[in-house]
Amino acid sequence: AKTFYYVASVTAAYRKALDQYLANPASDTFDLPYSVLDELNRTSHRHYSPGFYFGKEKALQTPSHTYVRDWDFIGTVDSWEDGVAHCTQRSKFCLGDSLEILQPDGSVVPVTPEWIKNAEGEAVDATPHPMMQYTIPCATPLMPYSLLRMQKRQ
């Protein structure tokens, strides 16, 4: 089963690819935008290969059957008002972490919150509790159901 984060990320990538192609469908060449593969690499996935596209004789197998998980889904945006995003935690992040917010329209907003406040309005250093309600500053207007993610620490 795939998570709604996976579905949202893959749908955003496919939408970008389709829009790019449909901008000039009569063209003999189509270069997939880097942003499409970049978005696909932000989800949990197995290594990519052309598989059997070039026939059984030239089939390529991936080097590993393990999943690539370089990014964590860390929360959802419930609402945004006056430069403040109201969010629900899915995984922990800490003050100073660099985040990305994937909006329902496929746009991505980078943000490094200057503060985090819990549901009581108290400043906190992290979001350690499952389904914790918190707020962070974000100057860019955000749509409800936007998804927060963070690159895993090495």
Regions of interest found by a model, annotated:
Residues 1-154:
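Surface-exposed amphipathic alpha-helical tracts and adjacent flexible/coil segments at the periphery
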